[in-house]
Amino acid sequence: MSIFLDQIEKRKLLEEASLAETFEKGTRRMGIGSSKRHAVPPSDHGAMRSVLDALGVTGYELTDSEMTTPEEQLNAILRPKGILTRKVSLKDNWWKQSIGPMLGYDREGNLTALLPTRWGFGYTFTDKDGETRPVNRKAMASSLSRHAITFCKPLPHKTLSQGDLLKFAFKSMSMTNLALLLATALVLALFGMFTPMANKMIFDIVIPTGEARDLLPIFGLLAGAGIGTMLFSLTRNLCTERIRRVVEMHLQNAVMARTFFLSPKFFTKNSSGELTARLDNVSKICSLLNDTIVGAFLTLLFSVVYVAQIFTYAQSVTLPSLAIIAVEIIALVLYYRSIVRARSEYTEKYNKLSGMEYGMFAGIQKLKLTGSERRALTLWLDKYTQATHRIYNPTLDRRLIPALLQLCNVGGTAVIFYFILANGVTTSDYIAFSSAYGMITAAITTIIAVIPEMAQIKPMLDSLNPILEETPEMEQNAPMVDELFGSIEMTEVSFRYSDDSPLVLDNISLSIAPGEYVGIVGKSGCGKSTLMRLLLGFEQPLKGSIYYDNYDLSKVDKTSLRRKIGCCLQNGSLFTGDLFHNITITAPWSTHDDAWEALRMADMEKDVRRMPMGLHTVVVEGSSGFSGGQKQRLLIARALIGHPQIIFFDEATSALDNISQKQVSDNLDSLNCTRIVIAHRLSTIRHCDRIIVLDKGHIAEEGNFDQLMEKKGLFYEMSLRQM
């Protein structure tokens, strides 16, 4: 009965807190409260609507609440849709780049929508008088701020195929740029038709008459075609580069965002080095498409216009010519498939090799300490040889097909000569036909040259399959967690890591009140860290439910929940960078004063102030410049920077001396937040309000330190080992 009474009491506390919060909001809206925020101006709403409409967001509602800023409202609307925001500085002539809709600021700090023009060349904004104006140097100098918010469109939050990825890339293109690219490619193909025409005119008109002056108009025609070809080639290259940059930006951001939203379980199956190699392929794919393949394929595609010329000049040779071209295309397909097989094997093994290389360099000190450099190098050489075997030792078909293509060209020319002689084609028609046919064979030769690059794309896309096939952790339209009071409840939770493994946690029920200090202890393998992973949503329980206040963990937006929790897990690490960004990474809005306060709470302030660069002290790979205790205190500071209502510590003070540990514990006592601590040292949990003893996946004992010692049970036996 006590469990149900505790739950009823907890519900009453939550209802009272909710009523107090609602009353506070009401008084602030009437001007009685102390909030310094103001209602959102109508112009800000207009700017936000314009940007949201441009992003294709529907089903949202903007309010005039004084409790939220426009940026907070925007984040609340976009977060369930998976659209990420980022603050940027607008430098130089930024409006000449197509980077999608943005939310900017005017000189008075009000929001304004920065929208691309209809044709994708330039931006417009709405001034304070409601007039739409183009963005230019004058507008930037007089009306607009140099700061804005950009948006990253996400990939769909479901299992994706390579086709879905390519479809997303296609949608990110500007249709204006795409139409311009196709138009310039067509014009270039049409310019190429002038050469066969000029050859025919020379042999039909100039040579028979012997009039040299007749060459002048033909020369002018060819010169104009040459200049036009040069200019349109430049336009095509610029357009291709523009498309590549836009597609690469959207695709790279979307794939990276999807990777970060994958469940923690995904990262246990893929090493950091391997994931880096896979993600790098996104940029490589865009570069390969832009640098070689798009141009070559557009040339081949529009070479169809030369078929019409072939038919016009030598109708009797058209069918044999098309047959030869068809044979060459079939050989190209076979050549492509043979290279793809070799590249697929190489790419997959290379990704694994990258993961191994990263691990070797990360553990280079251990390799040197144990004198294992030669063994590591031998292992690397063995894996490298396996990965590159098919690249340096191509199969027979890969060596034969290029030679057969050359033979096909020579043999095809002989066949064409035979049909020309047999059908009595005139000299002028033959010369014109030869020029047109040469354009087609030149396009095929270009394709042959880029096939090795083209064959890399399919294996690179295959390497992204683990990321595409994994479903992101984010649930569409899941409720956001705006505030926590600190209540946690687990009801009959069971969990196992695989279907054929035993239960790690078996029917665990646990209720933690707001502000309670709870310690969790037990022998190694009893399920302490697993319990923490379940509470953080890193794993899904086999059965049972977990609630934070009134939020069901299985249905809530887990990222917004974790932002309200300060967490310091076992074997945590610092990032490469400086101390300030390491501490504030979980709360990027924090100031230097906030960072110093977090360091003080973690008993690390004095140490950092003694460092010459203070908060700007550089953290190198592996955090080799810091002791184990300093590293743990920095991680504790990171957990405290956001002023969380719930704190999780998993062996977070194991490297601290007793004095530092007591100082940290005393500082945490002043926060009046819910604390859950996993520890082995009795000094860490001695002052807990409640200690939970786990054994073989069950709660074996429960009570405060003195009560458990009096029971002389499992906790008492564990404590004797430390006395």
Regions found by a protein language model. Give the residues of each.
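Helix-to-loop junction immediately C-terminal to a conserved catalytic motif
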Residues: 536
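Cytosolic ends of transmembrane helices, especially the final helix of ABC transmembrane type-1 domains
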Residues: 349, 353, 365-372, 396, ...
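Loop segments that connect adjacent transmembrane helices in multi-pass transporters
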Residues: 253, 257-274, 345-393, 479
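Membrane-integrated ABC transporters
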Residues: 1-195, 208, 212-217, 236, ...
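A hydrophobic transmembrane-helix motif
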Residues: 195-201, 293-336, 392-439
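Transmembrane-helix motif of ABC transporter permease domains
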Residues: 175-195, 201-249, 257, 268, ...
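ABC-family ATPase nucleotide-binding domain "signature/switch" substructure
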Residues: 530-533, 563-571, 579-582, 589, ...
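Primarily ABC-family ATPase nucleotide-binding module
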Residues: 468-519, 552, 593, 597, ...
